[in-house]
């Protein structure tokens, strides 16, 4: 990259994608917004961008029929690329252009999470094992832990604690929104003894720093590379008599979160185990929290319609 001339938006995306890969992030965050940008913006120097044209681009995505949440994700990726470019090039001084032009759309967070009951999740896991053992194991770990594929891909053999009555995985934190030095941290996530036994057998003979979960060809699952599982997972969902356009791998994560909420697990514990925030849990799963809160509260309701004779109160004689 020629540093003697101003960076273009396209070059800013290239820089951002390399930075994401270096930090263990998802390069899709750079690829996705790039596909929605016209050549006139991609080829333009970052330093010449204006708020009006960026706002016009953002609003054009809505006109094309993209959901507000999708538009917000696209503009967030563009903003991140532009911020990184400005950090590398002191000649870029127009940060206000994207702070104003790429402001977030209001009320764009409308959760459309697919929640599956336990029987359906088990059916998916069985179908996955029937399709491909390596895929089945990855999907079972996803179903039990509720972790993202990006986290599962970074699990190492040493992260498995299979011995003892309370087996667990030391789950890598997501790189999402974290500083570079945070992505190597792990948090213990409980797993079932049966799953621990399978993982221990699969990991036998591998080095401690070797990937715990491998694809059928022996390679690591590539987070951010949907081709590694997309078509196979669609086939699994169809085999489980479900709609692959509705049920995605994320449904296992959403179902895990709701499963914990419905057995009265404190929200802070749920958020920690699923590597998210209390705020996000409350915002995304508010309906399920409200339903469960209602069920708990009803147990303590006083029914004043019961006959007085049914109580322990003895009326006084005249």
Locations of regions flagged by a protein language model:
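Basic, Lys/Arg- and aromatic-enriched nucleic-acid-binding interface segment
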Residues: 68, 72-76, 87, 93-149, ...
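C-terminal catalytic core of Y-nucleophile DNA break-rejoin enzymes
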Residues: 178-200, 209-235
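Conserved tyrosine-mediated DNA breakage-rejoining catalytic core shared by Y-recombinases
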Residues: 99, 103, 120-123, 154-201
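DNA/chromatin major-groove-contacting recognition/catalytic segments
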Residues: 127, 187, 283-318
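Basic/aromatic-enriched alpha-helical hairpins
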Residues: 7-65, 81-83, 235-238
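C-terminal catalytic core of tyrosine-transesterase DNA break-rejoin enzymes
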Residues: 140, 144-151, 251-277, 291
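Catalytic-site neighborhood detector that most strongly recognizes the C-terminal catalytic loop/helix
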Residues: 115, 173-177, 274-299
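Short, polar N-cap/turn motifs at the start of nucleic acid-interacting alpha helices
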Residues: 159-166, 246, 265-284
């Amino acid at each position: 990259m020629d540093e003697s001339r101003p960076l273009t938006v396209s070059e800013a995306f290239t820089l951002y994608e390399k930075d994401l890969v270096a930090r263990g992030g998802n390069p899709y965050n750079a690829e996705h917004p790039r596909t929605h940008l016209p050549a006139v913006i991609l080829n333009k120097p970052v330093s010449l961008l204006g708020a009006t044209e960026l706002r016009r681009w953002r609003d054009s995505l809505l006109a094309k029929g993209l959901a507000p949440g999708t538009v917000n994700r696209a503009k967030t990726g563009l903003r991140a690329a532009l911020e990184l470019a400005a950090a590398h090039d002191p000649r870029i001084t127009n940060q206000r252009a994207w702070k104003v032009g790429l402001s977030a759309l209001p009320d764009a967070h409308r959760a459309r999470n697919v929640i599956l009951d336990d029987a359906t999740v088990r059916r998916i896991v069985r179908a996955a094992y029937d399709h491909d053992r390596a895929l089945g194991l990855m999907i079972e770990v996803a179903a039990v832990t509720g972790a993202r594929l990006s986290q599962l891909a970074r699990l190492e053999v040493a992260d498995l604690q299979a011995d003892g009555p309370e087996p667990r995985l030391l789950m890598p934190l997501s790189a999402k929104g974290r500083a570079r030095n945070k992505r190597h941290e792990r948090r213990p996530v409980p797993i079932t003894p049966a799953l621990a036994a399978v993982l221990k057998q699969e990991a036998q003979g591998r080095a401690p720093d070797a990937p715990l979960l491998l694809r059928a060809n022996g390679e690591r699952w590539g987070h951010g590379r949907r081709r590694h599982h997309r078509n196979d997972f669609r086939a699994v969902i169809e085999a489980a008599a479900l709609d692959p356009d509705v049920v995605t791998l994320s449904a296992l994560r959403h179902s895990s979160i709701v499963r914990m909420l419905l057995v009265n697990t404190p929200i802070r514990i749920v958020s920690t185990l699923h590597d998210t925030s209390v705020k996000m849990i409350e915002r995304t799963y508010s309906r399920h929290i409200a339903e469960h809160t209602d069920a708990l509260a009803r147990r303590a309701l006083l029914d004043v319609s019961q006959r007085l004779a049914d109580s322990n109160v003895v009326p006084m004689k005249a």
